[in-house]
């Protein structure tokens, strides 16, 4: 076959035209140490703090330590394929995660990748994991309520949209249950929820996700999971990833609730990384910037000003204490960062008072402004009554000859404790709470036997719903307490029937 000279020259010309003369400059380093989710590399003199670096096998890492001759890198993912002597190059980018509506209803890992087996997440929106929190002038004071559906919280330690409220207590005192119930109550509240599970057992997270799915809560929830078997960098990053996902909605004028379950495990993971990176240890072997670890995360929760769309992100961080010691390092740090705390008491929990909220040590610093007027009126003296009851109760153990006024206070206190008990995964709408607490504070429950109180409140709600539904409508529409005469009449009418049924 004869080869035409013209064809050859045409092919050569074509190749020459395609030839790219531009040079691509890459800064490449060499891995000198690898292990425990951390790598060290030399030759990356211009690497920036927090920059994404790419290893030879395609795994990414993040520059954490910038030293004179080496860079300390936390590895984002598995590190089994990385060896000493491998190359690692700069990308010039910082870490970003996928965000947007497409993530709602999904379970993702700390890199935003789906782990629920429901296929890939198609989104073209990404946000950086580390972002500066909104400044003072970009914020607005908290004024809208976040209804948790838990009587003890909505009445005693109300939470507002844009607030940071810490849930703190020993292990197995119902911290996660409190958060899950709050998520369930957001069903018709126009909220998007992000649940960040940090170092929780995979079986536990699976159970929580199934609960949310059965109750229809996955329709507005994103779950970010960093399990205990994953490398420490994933546990460290997971909360920031959740915050980035929440900010996408917040800056678009929506309302977000984010639960960090729990930040004690994030602090432990960060301590592990810092020690491997040879950072100087401080109190309890945590690094010096462990306060900044949590403050820069929790400051990202805010109520934005009207100019920025008026969106909000409410944070419910969870901290686990050891034997009720809230004066340990991490608990005191997070208490000082947040706008109040819900303290769960192990003794009350084991005594059957659930949720085991300690009214004396729980506080909400800004939520009072967000409480609806009706709730403010009926719950005004509840906290003081409960605190004085606890005081009297311990005093009453030493003597039985108490005067009538003290006996009455103790009786009211026992009924208050009973009213504030609530079954698991049964959040109560605010209008129902108002009616029940009104009946309590106005003495209608004083002569009901303690063991009948749960039945009394359930039947009272059903009665008002069927016979005086306008009371609920007034509370929902105006946020005000209905006419006292109408409420008294409804409760008295119900009580007449209830007393009869109890006497049978």
UniProtKB/Swiss-Prot annotation:
Its EC number is 7.1.2.2. ATP binds at residues 169-176. The keyword Protein transport does not apply. GO terms for cellular component: plasma membrane; proton-transporting ATP synthase complex. The keyword Ubl conjugation does not apply. It catalyses: ATP + H2O + 4 H(+)(in) = ADP + phosphate + 5 H(+)(out). SUPFAM superfamilies: C-terminal domain of alpha and beta subunits of F1 ATP synthase, N-terminal domain of alpha and beta subunits of F1 ATP synthase, P-loop containing nucleoside triphosphate hydrolases. It is a peripheral membrane protein. PROSITE patterns: ATPASE_ALPHA_BETA. It is found in: Cell membrane. InterPro entries: ATP_synth_asu-like_sf, ATP_synth_asu_C, ATP_synth_asu_C_sf, ATP_synth_F1_a_nt-bd_dom, ATP_synth_F1_asu, ATPase_a/bsu_AS, ATPase_F1/V1/A1_a/bsu_N, ATPase_F1/V1/A1_a/bsu_N_sf. The record marks 362 as: Required for activity. One of its GO terms (molecular function) is ADP binding. It is an enzyme of class 7 (translocase). Keywords: ATP synthesis, ATP-binding, Cell membrane, CF(1), Hydrogen ion transport, Ion transport, Membrane, Nucleotide-binding, Translocase, Transport. Signal peptide: none annotated. Produces ATP from ADP in the presence of a proton gradient across the membrane. The alpha chain is a regulatory subunit. F-type ATPases have 2 components, CF(1) - the catalytic core - and CF(0) - the membrane proton channel. CF(1) has five subunits: alpha(3), beta(3), gamma(1), delta(1), epsilon(1). CF(0) has three main subunits: a(1), b(2) and c(9-12). The alpha and beta chains form an alternating ring which encloses part of the gamma chain. CF(1) is attached to CF(0) by a central stalk formed by the gamma and epsilon chains, while a peripheral stalk is formed by the delta and b chains. Belongs to the ATPase alpha/beta chains family. This is ATP synthase subunit alpha. It comes from Leuconostoc citreum (strain KM20).
């Amino acid at each position: 076959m004869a080869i035409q000279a013209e064809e050859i020259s045409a092919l050569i010309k074509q190749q020459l035209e395609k030839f790219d003369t531009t040079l691509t400059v890459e800064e490449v380093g060499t891995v000198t140490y690898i292990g425990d989710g951390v790598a060290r590399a030399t030759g990356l003199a211009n690497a920036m703090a927090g920059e994404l670096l790419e290893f030879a096998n395609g795994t990414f890492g993040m520059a954490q330590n910038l030293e004179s001759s080496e860079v300390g890198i936390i590895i984002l993912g598995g590190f089994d394929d990385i060896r000493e002597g491998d190359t690692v190059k700069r990308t010039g980018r910082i870490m970003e995660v996928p965000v947007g509506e497409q993530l709602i209803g999904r379970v993702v890992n700390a890199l935003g990748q789906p782990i629920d087996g429901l296929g890939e997440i198609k989104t073209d929106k990404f946000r950086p994991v580390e972002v500066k929190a909104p400044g003072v002038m970009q914020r607005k004071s908290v004024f809208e309520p976040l209804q948790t559906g838990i009587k003890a919280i909505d009445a005693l330690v109300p939470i507002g949209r844009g607030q940071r409220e810490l849930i703190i207590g020993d292990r197995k005192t119902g911290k996660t249950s409190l958060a899950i119930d709050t998520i369930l109550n957001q069903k018709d509240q126009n909220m998007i929820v992000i649940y960040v599970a940090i170092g929780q057992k995979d079986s536990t997270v699976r159970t929580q996700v199934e609960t949310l799915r059965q109750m229809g809560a996955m329709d507005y929830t994103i779950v970010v999971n960093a399990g205990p078997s994953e490398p420490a960098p994933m546990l460290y990053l997971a909360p920031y990833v959740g915050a980035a996902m929440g900010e996408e909605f917040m800056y678009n004028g929506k309302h977000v609730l984010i639960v960090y379950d729990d930040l004690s495990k994030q602090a432990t993971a960060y301590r592990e990384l810092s020690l491997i990176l040879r950072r100087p240890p401080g109190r309890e072997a945590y690094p010096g910037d462990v306060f900044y670890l949590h403050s820069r995360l929790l400051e990202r929760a805010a109520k934005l000003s009207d100019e920025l769309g008026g969106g909000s992100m409410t944070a419910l961080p969870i901290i686990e204490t050891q034997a009720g010691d809230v004066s340990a390092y991490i608990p005191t740090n997070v208490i000082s960062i947040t706008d109040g705390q819900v303290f769960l008491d192990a003794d009350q929990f084991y005594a059957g008072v659930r949720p085991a909220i300690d009214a004396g040590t729980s506080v909400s610093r800004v939520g009072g402004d967000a409480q609806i007027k009706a709730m403010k009126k009926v719950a005004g003296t509840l906290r003081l009554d409960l605190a004085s009851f606890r005081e009297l109760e311990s005093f009453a153990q030493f003597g039985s000859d108490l005067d009538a006024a003290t006996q009455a206070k103790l009786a009211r206190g026992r009924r208050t404790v009973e009213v504030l008990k609530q079954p698991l995964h049964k959040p109560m709408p605010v209008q129902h709470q108002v009616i029940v607490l009104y009946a309590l504070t106005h003495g209608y429950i004083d002569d009901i036997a303690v063991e009948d109180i749960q039945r009394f409140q359930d039947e009272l709600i059903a009665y008002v719903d069927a016979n005086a539904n306008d009371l609920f409508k007034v509370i929902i529409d105006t946020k005000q307490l209905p006419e006292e005469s109408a409420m008294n009449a409804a409760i008295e009418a119900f009580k007449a029937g209830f007393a009869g049924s109890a006497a049978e």
